[in-house]
A protein has these predicted regions:
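Active-site catalytic loop in hydrolytic enzyme cores
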Residues: 1-53, 62, 68-76, 100, ...
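Short amphipathic alpha-helical surface micro-motifs
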Residues: 7-8, 16-20, 80-83, 108-114, ...
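C-terminal beta-strand edge segments of enzyme domains
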Residues: 25, 90-175
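CN hydrolase (nitrilase-like) catalytic-core segments centered on the catalytic cysteine
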Residues: 41-129
């Protein structure tokens, strides 16, 4: 699969890079994989679109700060879209914290379960492995109520507006 980052950073060296136009999903050995590169993960819609396109696992290559809010957001993307999420990040100050989250957030008895599969610290350099039970994830997606189950698409139309309103207008925005 060839994929270009959709949400480039207008405030950094990426300002002059042409952004991708769509999110893509591919089949890899029977698993539907989607990709969100770095800043793409800042937008919940990125994961939602990948879920709508059939992604079961979303890979997130990342090379920027991994503050706890960003780490928690990936757990939330896994939960709300019923997809597994795995992020790889270099180690070091304001980085590190490669992580993986399962979409499974409660068991068959309705008891909440921790969906953390892997959470590395920000100092250790290495290769980390996260294993997802795809059979369990697929069974979970077939029985639970999140993802696209009860979504009211007509209420989401404002997400398609290109208008940027105060206080979010910035000098030099590439639009």
């Amino acid at each position: 699969m060839k994929y270009s980052k959709v949400h480039t950073c207008d405030f950094a060296d990426e300002r002059d890079v042409e952004s991708g136009k769509e999110f893509k999903v591919c089949d890899f050995e029977g698993i539907q994989l989607g990709i969100m590169i770095c800043y793409d993960r800042e937008y919940p819609e990125s994961a939602r679109i990948l879920m709508l396109k059939g992604a079961e696992v979303i890979l997130v290559p990342n090379d920027c700060g991994s503050m706890q809010a960003r780490i928690r957001a990936l757990s939330t993307r896994a939960y709300e879209n019923m997809v597994a999420v795995a992020m790889a990040n270099p180690n070091g100050d304001s980085a590190g914290c490669s992580c993986a989250y399962s979409s499974i957030c409660w068991d068959r008895n309705g008891k909440c379960v921790d969906n953390t599969v892997l959470l590395a610290d920000d100092k250790t350099e290495g290769i980390f492995y996260a294993e997802f039970d795809m059979e369990a994830i697929r069974e979970y997606r077939n029985r639970e109520m999140l993802g696209n189950t009860f979504r009211k698409v007509e209420a989401d139309s404002q997400l398609l507006s290109k208008e940027i309103k105060k206080p979010f207008i910035r000098d030099g925005q590439n639009r």
